[in-house]
Amino acid sequence: MKIACISLGCPKNQVDLDVMVHILLSAGHETVADLAEADVILVNTCGFIESAKTEAIENILEACSYKQQNPELKVIVTGCLAERYRSQIEEEIPEVDAVVGCASNKAIDTIVARLFHGEDHLESYGAKKDFPLGGKRVIGTPAHYAYLKIAEGCNNRCHYCAIPGIRGPLRSRDMADCVAEARWLAGEGVKELIVVAQDPTAYGEDWGKPGSICELLDKLNRVPGLEWIRIMYAYPERITDEFIAAMKRNEKVVPYLDLPIQHCNDTILKNMNRRSNRAELLEVIGKLRREIPGITLRTTLIAGFPGETEEQFEDLCNFVKEVKFDRLGCFAYSAEENTVAAKMDGQIDQETKDKRAELVMQIQTGIMAQKQAEKVGQTVHVLCDGIDEESGLYLCRTTGDAPEVDGNVCVSSEEPLYPGQFYDVLVDDSDLYDLYGTVAK
């Protein structure tokens, strides 16, 4: 069978899809890029917040529309939306042939076979403790970078977050298994390894070994062939002296962290069930910048959390001005069913939430413009991702730019640059998100 895949959501979801694609290929199926050619369309969904759910539903409906020209087409929905809304998907979109929960990913080949043996409207779910950790996979990203998922689930229980209800509690992946996959990825040509989980800094806590991320970084740093190791998502309360020391002693670990602080006001943080306060956040950020000069810090903020007053929002704005994060995203609070925050008093209207998020981003725009302009005249070390055919510029990234999240260094060069190769680039211009330059002589 010809299988087409639509991948939505976070890098962790991409890894799940990579495992499913490997299973399908091993069963004798083939993948195609064109949905119109497919016998099966697999929609791997995100269901984290309202905008992600909307995007997922739009893609499911698009996949189902191909049944008009191919009535035998099968549409399978997997991922977080499938896990979260089991019966609703089949009830509201009856054109869907199978809804597969995350714990059943490894049965995807059996589900495809059952569909083509005449069964329909299949549902397959397992216990959250059975969500697969690791497994043989394809590399669904460009060949020179890949995501390594080191854990599943989360124990943080933030009051706004639906993930523990979807993905279950923290289950850390065996360290030897993580290192073995990293070695395989490096052998396949991966130069940049991006370590992901809901909270990588919690790795090993379910074994009773907090701080195990430090040992894992030591081992990953010794994998031949890897050049950059990037840690995505680091919770402030787990940025210990030991963690900072591990970043410093392992030269392949790039000076980059995404700290999802969500807010800075002590009352709001407490209501979110976050474990840091404003003073502790400032201390951690200051220590990171002192100990790792040049580190790029990204964060995510929520505006309009239930009960957020004008004064508390102003506190957030002042914090953004004071800290000057290198990268920042601010989102209007999304009330997710079956979360504590959705039942709180003081829900804020959508217009106000959107306006507050926009104001934070306006502040960050000024900060970004200044930081970008300061890089003009510098020489930066970059990894080439490929070429933009329209502009003819090569798209590269510094250690401060995560793929698909941050900006690019757009390089003009008479000589060809190659994906997966490193270059030194002289920056001669900038805009809000990207730098521009030429290969340094």
Language model segments and positions:
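Proteins enriched for Cys/Gly/acidic motifs involved in redox and nucleic-acid/cofactor modification
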Residues: 1-203, 242, 257, 279-290, ...
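Radical SAM enzyme [4Fe-4S]-AdoMet core and its adjacent flexible, acidic
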Residues: 10, 203-225, 272, 335-366
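Conserved SAM/AdoMet-binding glycine-rich loop
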Residues: 75-79, 84, 89, 187-311, ...
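Short, hinge-like loop/turn segments at secondary-structure boundaries
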Residues: 93-94, 116-118, 211-213, 247-248, ...
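Short acidic/polar active-site loop segments enriched in Thr and Asp
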Residues: 97, 191, 227, 326, ...
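Conserved, mostly hydrophobic/aromatic
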Residues: 178, 195, 231, 259, ...
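Active-site proximal loops enriched in glycine and acidic residues that flank catalytic Cys/His/Asp
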Residues: 197, 233, 261-263, 299-303, ...
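Terminal RNA-binding accessory module
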Residues: 343-441
